[in-house]
């Protein structure tokens, strides 16, 4: 069995008296696609931040065995990047915050940027201002940015937010192609499970300081979610899509959408 590219061991995270999760043991295998779900404030984004070292766990450990690529949430007011060329945005991933690169470093950087742009079919956007591109085109560039270091695992934070259905499918197909070609694992935080349903190997569902891990069928069923929330939840499959209804706080709505947090 291949060594896990990401491992949570007895991990937990609490803020004051509020626990987001505890006793989480999770091994992410090369090429595995894990969807991270949960309601507003359950800690999905915070989970990714713990992998990035931006938030310290209060219990246990998290270990990444390989390079990490990160696709952050898009924000409508992200004006700092709108005037950049596509190539410049992607180049931030290759730079890694380094300064003073020599000629050899610049050539290597250019090669990696060009390769990443080509991998996501975004070469034609290389010299276009990011602000002139559609949301889907911008997201191609952010995926390319994450790929410049040839990551073993991709952390994706709501990469489908604010995208139309066509652009959502493009993004999901790009990520799936990468994991199949390079065995890059994907940890995918999302409001909507249905767009990625055909690709998901396992679900990590966070809610009320607890969690469930398993296949889609093991987690996304009425009994499992009702137990997790402590209130009646109904899960129905309609035409190959999941519909989740229930919860007095209206965590669920048709086609498994969540009114989730911007920084959960």
What are these regions (language model features)?
Residues 221-223, 227-264:
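ABC ATPase nucleotide-binding domains
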Residues 91, 106-125:
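Conserved ABC ATPase "signature" region
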Residues 190-191:
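H-loop/switch region of ABC-family ATPase nucleotide-binding domains
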Residues 150:
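Conserved catalytic motifs of ABC-family nucleotide-binding domains
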Residues 202-216:
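H-loop (His-switch) and adjacent beta-strand-loop-beta switch element
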Residues 129-133, 137:
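Conserved ABC ATPase signature
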Residues 154-158:
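Catalytic Walker B motif of ABC-type/P-loop ATPase nucleotide-binding domains
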